[in-house]
């Protein structure tokens, strides 16, 4: 897979304590764009691939978005990429300084093309210190960009924005490990509202699959087989970094009552997008039962119900026949002497 970098620049954000005790991020701006080289394209390819594998939120620009106005000027060639990057860096520094997770870092702004799609990528990368051995076999300190682990990043699908103004997914951002606050920051920085909700889309997909099997009058074993087909397809999409294509998924499934899954989903109006970002945590319920509470965590394959695992609804209990060997060994080691 090849990537074409059109324009790229790096700036620095430096964290300092302000006189009022709050955090302040100062910008150190580069005077010119980076020259496109094999190293630059390799950097962006690795950032693109790392971004693809991260959990993302989706948004759309508000009408009053300052960032969107600056971006539109760039796309209409009313300004160049370098001055656009200056405005973006200052805006990001101002907004990020309002949050406790703000840190210094290298700001990457890049306009690139991947698989016939144009993107604008924005990320704040931190630097790590490591050691190297020089040509004289001496140990030296060195700094490197941490391009595999980053939380502050957003990407705009410029092709989608240009061709489909009503899209609810052209703007994405990493949700990050610090929860909702990262989403709040990006909404403020980009001047955006929430767009596509992947959680809702995945839940609606699960409901559509269950209803499809029910209207097809499948028995439990047949239903579980269809759900496993769905999960296997979705797992493959996750592993390859791709989204769930509704039409493609439909081709993997049997036709029931002379209707394909795609036709059934459209007729019932589940509100499913043609392409859905997969969420492993939600999709695993296709083939597993799991739950936790009151000090107990249980997870098992759905096909084991009424075989090795018996559910008694009236007694509110599960009976497990054939414990996992490692659990049985722990019980013997730790509890036998107590009896």
Curated annotation (Swiss-Prot):
Keyword Transferase attributed: no
One MF annotation (Gene Ontology) recorded for this entry: double-stranded DNA binding
Keyword terms: Cytoplasm
Entry GO terms, CC: bacterial nucleoid; cytoplasm
Cell location: Cytoplasm, Nucleoid
Primary location group: cytoplasm
Recorded family membership: Belongs to the YejK family.
Record protein name field: Nucleoid-associated protein Asuc_0779
Species classification: Bacteria, Pseudomonadati, Pseudomonadota, Gammaproteobacteria, Pasteurellales
């Amino acid at each position: 897979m090849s990537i074409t970098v059109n324009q790229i620049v790096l700036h620095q954000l430096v964290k300092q304590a302000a006189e009022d005790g709050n955090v302040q991020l100062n910008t150190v701006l580069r005077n010119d764009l980076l020259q496109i080289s094999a190293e630059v394209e390799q950097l962006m390819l690795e950032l693109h691939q790392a971004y693809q594998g991260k959990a993302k939120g989706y948004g759309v620009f508000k009408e009053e978005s300052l960032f969107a106005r600056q971006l539109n000027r760039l796309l209409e060639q009313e300004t160049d990429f370098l001055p656009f990057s200056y405005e973006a860096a200052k805006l990001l520094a101002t907004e990020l300084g309002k949050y406790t997770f703000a840190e210094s870092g290298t700001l990457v702004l890049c306009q690139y093309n991947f698989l016939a799609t144009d993107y604008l990528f924005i990320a704040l990368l931190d630097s790590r210190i490591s050691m190297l051995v020089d040509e004289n076999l001496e140990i030296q300190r060195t700094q490197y960009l941490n391009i595999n682990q980053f939380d502050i990043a957003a990407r705009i699908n410029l092709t989608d924005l240009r061709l489909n103004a009503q899209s609810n997914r052209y703007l994405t951002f990493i949700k990050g490990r610090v929860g909702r606050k990262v989403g709040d920051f990006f909404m403020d920085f980009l001047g955006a509202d929430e767009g596509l909700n992947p959680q809702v889309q995945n839940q609606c997909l699960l409901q559509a699959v269950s209803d499809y099997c029910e209207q097809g009058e499948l028995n439990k074993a047949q239903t579980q087989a269809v759900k496993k087909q769905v999960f296997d397809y979705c797992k493959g999409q996750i592993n390859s970094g791709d989204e769930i294509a509704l039409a493609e998924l439909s081709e993997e499934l049997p036709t029931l009552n002379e209707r394909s899954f795609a036709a059934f989903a459209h007729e019932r109006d589940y509100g499913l997008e043609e392409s859905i970002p997969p969420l492993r945590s939600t999709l695993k319920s296709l083939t597993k039962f799991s739950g936790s509470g009151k000090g107990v965590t249980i997870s098992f394959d759905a096909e084991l119900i009424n075989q090795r695992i018996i559910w008694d609804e009236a007694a509110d209990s599960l009976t497990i026949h054939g414990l996992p060997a490692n659990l049985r060994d722990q019980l013997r080691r730790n509890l036998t002497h107590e009896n």
